[in-house]
């Protein structure tokens, strides 16, 4: 199945998430050091070279020296599409198994990477491929290649029944976690409706419980022997590396791995529908949602690029036709989105709309059909084509800033190579977008969207567990003959262990340059000239805490309204102008402040700043837009309350801080239905005048500019800006006392297959001298994958997909929160384990060990050189420097403090938390969890609703 279980978002900024435009078929291995095609004129490019080992491993190399890191990205051409009946979920299960150590590196695969400061490490599986990726310091590349090659060539001896059972349990809890979310079963239904039983995309990537339970150790090993060889993989190395180095190291570590069978890929099968179909389902959701899906052209077809542009015009932006009609004119929905998502055998065009309360979904469907038919008949306008093209080209420019991670340059090259055989196929996609016309876009839409689609309508009601397909006894897995590919003599003696990393790159952070604008604002600039983009963030006081004594949610709502029309431009015109410039503008609030953000293409910096200034200085706050956003906002609060995590994080803050405290509000800052419902234009204007003003504000600029260039431009647009009246004082955030004893609050979620457990307490401010020490203390207990809580509940007990703890930043006391989603029948046991771990750690009974502290120091310190690869990461760090009055060299001082920490200091910092004063919030099916939790005798137990109000009649 090709559907993601995450909510639909706007089409990804990088156009390369879509199908890329070369024909599918057998992989073509280009000669070494040869690039397939020249870049499209005027475009940002990803230069690469490549070679292929004798055993079939294809290696692609991209050099980018801006940071001393290398992205290692390996794609195996196997996914859920390759699973036979009775073995669903095998590809995803193996993704997990391959993180559990190999023959020569037993234990957690993450550990050696953590020790060298690797960043962005992850693995994913979808219908078509499995990938693993990480960014490592250049000096740790040997370690990374040794580890990746060991699990490719030396894994099976490390997989035993215990490991299989452990990871099977983790995967099953991942499945429960996804299905426990609102709309969480939708994509399983869509897969079944869009593809016949015989189609490789019919079943879900995560598989069925029955097949997961039936997986035998020999089945799993034979699956690996079939698919995970060098001749079925593409390795991309991007960053601080060159071709010669890559050749030497890859041959050394991978060259002796024998090839596996050459497996034929399934034929392209778009599974077109001859006519429209529909289905309905009920779920524990706050509002009706409409999904409409078409099967469309596969990866590698220019039509899919054209459909991306079609999607952008139809429903891909705030000024799209469906947004204009359904949100602005007819006011029938709270949100609408479209997207085209590529896959190897056939892609999907996806539409989703959240129907307003009280609106007949049939009316929404009728408007969707009307607008779709109009666009298919007449095509987009020239302006719409130009704007859509600019949006995607700007997104590509922003996306290629990163060498690794989701959508980074290594990901782009691997995706192209695996699915089209041409690592440079993104250039074809760019060319298609450059050459697209209104007629070609309309024609592509007509070819695919005039065919049958499936509509699924989800309405509020009971959640009914989906029946799984009947269990099938799988046919014996017969291994095909292995190709007699030549391999080299082993280049390393693996019995000597993992290569050591003896040195690490120096931390480099951009020099912060400062200036003053004529309006009194401070400018802080960090130059970054790797891509032609400039990012700006105007930082103000007045965040959620400013809502205290006023209507909760005012700060977030007011800031969110700034880009809904400004100056002479109404909401739609403002969106159109931003898209035509390729600019991203937004504004929002956080606990202690607010900010307005601009990402501008260098070529359009001046007009983008002009639009940005209009947004901040002259927001329109039109009543019709207030009414529209208010309705959507209230619906969003309903969505928060329907999600287990969202409900808990709305209820917890008032319990930690006490009613009336500036922080005693939902951590989302969204307010309540009542407070948002009572907001009027005067409230928004008052907030904007009081807090969005240049005095005491800071403009952070990161990107392709200089102080000499940017200050005159900022003065041009903001120099004469003055605040009205006296600026209000920053809200005083007083400390609160902890409760005298443990408290437990339960929120009912009938029928839930998981319980979501939260435990919280207040700890000192981010400005406290001991804040860094506490951050390391938190990392040991729950702030890292290798932490005590996660190793216990996920890796040892496999009751949870992941347990963690965190301490968000705050000027006042910070909330420390531990959390874990667990299988419903292990709720009380999981709480008992969490309580034991927390009590033993924070009381000093089982204090942090030297090894634990050293591990967290290594993770924090050695990852720093790679942490500032992107302008966004630099911008965020400067934002913290500004908000918390830190020195400009804070990143270096923090590094030095972490390096100097001892276990005794971390133990003392951990003593900040009092395990006897914890507040527990648990969301789950009370029929299953209430009695076992009460039997734990943690403390007083209260039953509350998703607003934190006592439930009448509860014990």
Predicted region positions:
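Bacterial N-terminal signal peptides that target proteins for export
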Residues: 2-18
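Bacterial N-terminal signal peptides
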Residues: 14-28
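Proteolytic maturation boundary segments
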Residues: 26-29, 33-59, 242-282, 293, ...
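M16 family metallopeptidases and their MPP-like homologs
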Residues: 60-62, 67-85, 89-93, 107-154, ...
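A common structural junction motif
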Residues: 149-159, 253-261, 369-380, 615-621, ...
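Short, conserved secondary-structure transition motifs
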Residues: 170-178, 269-283, 388-400, 600, ...
